[in-house]
Structure formats: C-alpha cells, structure tokens
Amino acid sequence: DTMLEKNVGTLTFDVGGGIYVMNHNNSLGFAKGEMCSPGLATQAEDLYAAGVKELIHVGFAGGNKIGDYVLTDGAYNDTSITRLYGFKGELIESTKDLTDSFCIELEKKGISCIRGYHWTTDGGYVQPEWRGRYFLNDMGAKCVEMEGAGLFTIANFRSRKATAIYIVSDSGSNDEWNLGWGESTLENSIQKLIDALVKS
C-alpha cells in the first residue's frame, strides 16, 4: 500500500494480484503479497507463469527488536504447502545468489540486515513458541512469519529465484508480544526500506 501511495509504479499486468512496473525502471515491478504460505505460493505460481524471473518478498515478522531487518537464507518450515510440492525437509532455502546480490544493494543504500534462517508457520496466533523451538536452540531462527516457506517452495519447484526481507514489526523478546504498529521505530524502518527499493 505504501508503494502505491508513493505513485512509483504503473499497473501493467493483471496477474498475481496485479503487477506494477516501476516508472523509473521497467525491468522492476511490485505486487501486493498475499497472506500466508498457501496464498503467497499461489501468487508466486501466477507471477512465475507470467514470466517473472525473480521474486523478493518484503514482509513483516515477529522478532527480537522492532524495526530490525532480517534478510533470510531460507525458512524452517512449519507449513503444509511445502509437503504438497514434495519438499519434506524441515528447511527450505531461498536463492543464495539473489540473496547475496540483494544484500550488497541494501548495504550500498545504508541498510544493514540480520542475516540467517527464519521460521515460517501457518499458526499466526501461536508464534510466541518460536523462541523455544527455533531461536533458543541450535537452529537460531532470526524471526517468525507466515509466507516465506510458500514462496521458496514454488521458486525451488519451478527452478526460479526468490528471497525475502522482513521488518520486525512485533517483538517476542518478552513474555508477551509487543506490537510495533504506530511506533516511530517501525515506521522509520518501513520508509527507509521503501525509499531504498524505489531508488533501485
């Protein structure tokens, strides 16, 4: 929604929720992502079928510090969509070369990220468990969200490229979730990332 408010792209293709091609660079575009792994997986199928070669998901996640950026190397899978596509392992990778090049571009624009694996779950209201299951043990998940595993499943299945960056919007660093919506820290992180993407 914020990208649309900035009027930086033009709706060009009515597929995958609508592809907006960037006004300053017609090789780049954006679409509003669907919610949850099955939704984003279906959207990714549509976008890849329409000819999109690479997808970078920009989303929100629960993590340790509101406003932090997490650039993911892949997702610990706690969803059903991956198994339907034949991926039975606990971890599904993002595309390393795309993640590496995106990391370099972000650094050039002054955005530093926490990098590593994260947890994708279908259970949006039981996410506080992530600290015990994935963060506090040797797995070291950097955040928890609900779409990444679905996207990476389709990218791997279709031999396309995908990665993701998450802005920590709520914190599980205490016994209860602290929601960052409306806080200047979160809003500043959102605007900084969007400004960097618009200038890509």
Residue map of PLM features:
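Metabolite-binding pocket within alpha/beta catalytic cores that recognizes anionic/polar moieties
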Residues: 1-97
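Conserved active-site and cofactor/substrate-binding residues in soluble primary-metabolism enzymes
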Residues: 35-38, 42, 50, 93, ...
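Hydrophobic/aromatic beta-strand patches that form the interior of the parallel beta-sheet core
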Residues: 56, 70, 114-116, 163-165
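Glycine-rich beta-alpha junction loops
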Residues: 62, 119-124, 150, 167-171
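Active-site rim beta-loop-alpha module in soluble metabolic enzymes
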Residues: 90-138
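Generic non-transmembrane alpha-helical segments
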Residues: 101-109, 154, 192, 196-200
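A C-terminal functional module that forms or caps the active site or interfaces directly
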Residues: 130-169
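His/Asp/Glu-rich mid-to-C-terminal helical/loop segments that flank catalytic regions of hydrolases
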Residues: 172-200
